[in-house]
């Protein structure tokens, strides 16, 4: 940096403005809120923006503050804030929700991390197995949690697998986890960590710091809390929602009402409901999805 620029920067006067109202720490003075997930996993909320909120309000106020700057009005009554937040979410005005951010410390199996990282709208820094030795921790489900392949969802599993085959799977995991001993022995003999790691199973645990804004976090939660997602990542998504809800309760309520527990109808579906006629398509998957929606919309109607 040149001397001239240094001089110009030194001339800048920073005014530390005192707030007009009293503020409090939305995390209650704690440096982290932590929840255990599965056998060795966890999710910890380590920071949030805003960290301070006016007494009597939650971090939801930041959403309204950003929205109202458009027309020059400051923060108003809390009751008005709730209506505004619900309006913004309902009409997909997303940028005010991006003003709230959360930083998490997450520990999860590699196979979950690889699904998780598909959501590319976050900032991530992961444990590096090139620089460090991976810990001897593996995800090992109970026999009741071993699921058979779904007949309707190619990506998922549904009801529990019969005990004999489930036990065979758990025995298979035990054998795979024995690779860790070989991994350690080879590292001690001088094998590079970046190569040694490639023989380890995706059930081994990794960890990262993950920072994301509320708008993109809601998108992540809508997909990963859904019953069609893999149960293991759904457990993490549910935990994240439980951690953020006390901080932005109004926004979370809007998310549940207008996204997570809502239905999206296509033009063909609206026409079929309006006319009482079958769905105008031969696509079997579309028809099945429409039938599921009708069960939710008209639960007392006979098939």
UniProtKB/Swiss-Prot annotation:
Binding-site residues, FAD: 95, 118-120, 126, 213-215, 219
InterPro entries linked: Thymidylate_synthase_ThyX, Thymidylate_synthase_ThyX_sf
Motif ThyX motif, residue range(s) on this chain: 118-128
Cited function: Catalyzes the reductive methylation of 2'-deoxyuridine-5'-monophosphate (dUMP) to 2'-deoxythymidine-5'-monophosphate (dTMP) while utilizing 5,10-methylenetetrahydrofolate (mTHF) as the methyl donor, and NADPH and FADH(2) as the reductant.
Lineage: superkingdom: Eukaryota
EC number: 2.1.1.148
Cofactor(s) recorded in Swiss-Prot or TrEMBL: FAD
Protein name according to UniProt: Flavin-dependent thymidylate synthase
Keyword Hydrolase: no
Gene3D superfamilies: 3.30.1360.170
Pathway participation: Pyrimidine metabolism; dTTP biosynthesis
Gene Ontology terms for molecular function: flavin adenine dinucleotide binding; NADPH binding; thymidylate synthase (FAD) activity; thymidylate synthase activity
GO BP annotations listed: dTMP biosynthetic process; dTTP biosynthetic process; methylation
UniProt subunit comment: Homotetramer.
GO CC terms of this entry: phagocytic vesicle
Reaction(s) this enzyme catalyzes, per UniProt: dUMP + (6R)-5,10-methylene-5,6,7,8-tetrahydrofolate + NADPH + H(+) = dTMP + (6S)-5,6,7,8-tetrahydrofolate + NADP(+)
Residues that, per the record, bind dUMP: 115-118, 126-130, 197, 224
Keyword NADP carried by entry: yes
Enzyme active site: 224
Cofactor remark: Binds 4 FAD per tetramer. Each FAD binding site is formed by three monomers.
Keywords recorded for this protein, A-Z: FAD, Flavoprotein, Methyltransferase, NADP, Nucleotide biosynthesis, Transferase
Sequence ranges assigned to domain ThyX in this UniProt record: 41-258
